[in-house]
Amino acid sequence: MVLKFGTFRLKINIEREVFCLFINSVMIIDMIRIFTGNTMVTNLCRNGIYLLILFFVCMDACNKKRVNNLLGMGILYIVFALFSLLVNGSDVNSLLLSGSMIFISRCLVGFYLARNIQIDEGLWNSIKKYYVLVIVYCIVYANMGSLDQYGMREGYMTFSYNILIPTTLILIMMIQRQQGRVLKLIISTFLTIQLIVMGARGPVACMAVSIIIFIWIQLAQFPLYKKLIACGAFSLAAILVYFARDEILDYMLSINSTSRTLILLKNGNLFDLSNRNSYYEILIEEIKRNIILPHGLYADRVILNQNFSGSSAISGQYAHNLFFEILYQFGGVFGGAILFAFFIKVYKSIKHLELINNQIITAFYCAFATGLISLLFSSSYLINERAWLFIGIVFAFSNIKYLTLKSNG
């Protein structure tokens, strides 16, 4: 699309710009919250941004005859939602209402955008512009964010998930590309420190696993001697970090002494489940009791709300684990089949990435994988748009012909 201002012309790829806006939308909304401190203004901006993106997606789907991409997932969701309403009755009314709005305006939109976006140098150039905003967001949060009753910085989990994809993406791009490596190193180091020092432990784990996936894909292209050298280098780095762990921790705690991640690490409680094991035990027993019949969407909230109280994804308590959530909602047999089919697609997409060997596509794939990884211990697939970005890419990349078209531009 070309915009004209007198004699000035500006060529814009609308699909690409909307995709980049969507990826950074939660961060932008949180910045508005911090600056204004006004819930009504924040909600208006949030609704405006997501409605604008949803409008673009609907128009794009109609113009490019991609309506089936939306209808397929949309119809499946409606069918499962109606089944849940039939099984659970009024217990899921409010959950379905608020959850459906989020699923349609964010998750389904994220799936569509990622399923159809052209991942190339142009997309990387478009997303690079947002790193100035990401850095400003980190500075604003560190200096303007308020503390809660426990002395922790409010919204630290939201903050860390907001910068997770940009941090992982630029870190991978820094590793694999020599051009502009010094600047990428500075930015990725700054963002990684912010993620660890100011954020939650979950996003740090997501980034670490994503980097491991990236290394695995890259090593597949190396001859044996290079694989041995790489493994030796990573092992040496891990040993050095281990022996210098106390000094590193003390330095990071000097930056933010209230960091929950660093305090847990210092006290040896980094892998504490924070009562998640209680949720898992209840869901496991319920799945064993009725392994065939499904319970319906959001049904894990219903059963856990009967045993616990507190805030969560949408309302009350929730599974905090993709496997338990799917198995309980869809039943052990059907849910297991869904998980098996999906992870077969993930495996195929990774093998196709190895075959294509495209640096930019691999970088985006691994960065978006953080969305799925986070579902193993936090959030819910029904409200997490980052996970649906990855699901969209998996659906696209599990088809080798489609991936080849993306790679060739």
Where would I find each of the regions flagged by the language model?
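Hydrophobic transmembrane alpha-helices and their immediate junctions
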Residues: 66, 329-372, 398
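A membrane-periplasm/extracellular boundary helix in multi-pass inner-membrane enzymes
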Residues: 193, 197, 218-266, 284-285
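N-terminal signal-anchor transmembrane segment
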Residues: 1-62, 77-90, 138-143, 373
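Aromatic-anchored transmembrane helix interface
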Residues: 44-53, 70-82, 91-115, 156-164
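Interfacial loop-to-transmembrane-helix boundary motif in multi-pass membrane proteins
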Residues: 16-19, 66-78, 101-104, 111-139, ...
